[in-house]
Structure formats: C-alpha cells, structure tokens
C-alpha cells in the first residue's frame, strides 16, 4: 500500500501528527464518548456545527452501551471506542439528524458497517436486532430527533 500523501496535498484530511496515534492527542474536541446518560444538547450542537452543520456521525458499542459522537469519519469514533476497550465486531456506525423527529433522525449507514464475515455486506446495518439496539442507544445517549437549541 502506498504511503498517504502529506496533509498539504489533502487539505480536508486531519492526519495525526507523527508519533501521536491516539485520537485524544489530535482530535480531543471533536469526539465525545457517552458511557451512560445522555450527551448535553449544547455539546451535541457544538459537534453538529463543528463538522457537518445538520448531522453528526456516531459509533455505537452494542454490547457495552457506549456511544462515540462526533468526528469527520465513523472511523474516528470507532478508534475512540477501541481505545476504551470495545471490540470491533460490536461497533456500528450511524448518522444522527437533530430536528427530524424519532422516525427520521437515524441513518444506519457507515463504511465501518461493511463486514461480510458478520453477514453485513452493505454500508447500511442489515440485521434488524443490531438496528434496534443502535436505535435504543441513540435515543438513550444522543436524542430522539428533537431540535437543538
């Protein structure tokens, strides 16, 4: 695999500085891990505004119940949860759209969801049980599609 080009050649990329691999060292303000309770609405607003303006990417650990909210890519949240002890097979990515209501606020799509070994051959979460668990944890840790202040 060829090496990645330098950041100047890819201004949209945020590469970790040399010798700093942990997400906390290079994107501490861009990801919030919620282990219990719900993320504060002002913090969620900050993350929505920081990256995409109308949505936020997040990753759910369906076994431990933790959720990593934020980041430019789902892989950022995945890395955050892996560093905290999650197992990769338990991590699923989705997008949250505040203000769309309960039925429209979750998009179950992410590149990290492509895993043929687990029977998921698509970016979208295909297993109904996994989708339901992601939905439960989204409502418990992030929100139910209500508008943000």
Across the structure, where does each feature detected by a protein language model lie?
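Ala/Thr-enriched low-complexity intrinsically disordered regions
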Residues: 8-9, 16
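Negatively charged, low-complexity tracts enriched in Asp/Glu with abundant Ser/Thr
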Residues: 38-80
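Short histidine-centered catalytic/ligand-binding loop motif
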Residues: 40-48, 116-127
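Amphipathic, interaction-prone secondary-structure segments
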Residues: 72-103
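Intrinsically disordered, low-complexity regulatory segments enriched in Ser/Thr/Pro
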Residues: 98, 102-125
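Well-ordered alpha/beta subsegment
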Residues: 123-149
